[in-house]
Amino acid sequence: IRLLHSLTPPPPPPPPPPPPPPPPPPPPPPPPPPPPPPPPPPPPPPPPPPPPPPPPPPRRARIHHNIPLFLRFFKKSYSSHFHWRCGQRNHCHSFVCKRLLVAYPVRHFLSAACQFLPWLSINSFSGTEMLNNRFHGLITL
């Protein structure tokens, strides 16, 4: 029996265990984030400001259109040299002076008389006249 036992082939070895299942594939990497949108283009520069308007031409002194009427107030022929002597703030009591000059503003009469009546001699006028914007100074004829 021992002999028989030794002659019998050994039992086959047990089958090897099945190989372990392969590990699951790693999850795919997440897709890369989309690139940030490009920055908006800078706003266009504001248009340059319009050039300033040219300065107005200097105004010329107007010739008062009533100068001939002004001369018509004279009833007689007087000397052609008039002097406003108001440095002493003398007030005029002359009827001719008041009648002729009370209605003429200083600025208009000066600008007109200096051009229209070149023989007119204006010495000065007082602060009182400037306040009233009229001629009330002493006229020497």
Swiss-Prot record:
The keyword DNA-binding is assigned to this record: yes
One annotated GO molecular function? DNA binding
> What keywords does the record list, in alphabetical order?
DNA-binding
- DNA-binding region ranges: 98-116
Query: Residues annotated as region Disordered?
Result: 1-61
Where does the record place Pro residues bias?
Answer: 8-58
Q: What is this protein called?
A: Uncharacterized proline-rich protein
Q: What is the lineage of its organism?
A: Eukaryota, Metazoa, Spiralia, Lophotrochozoa, Annelida
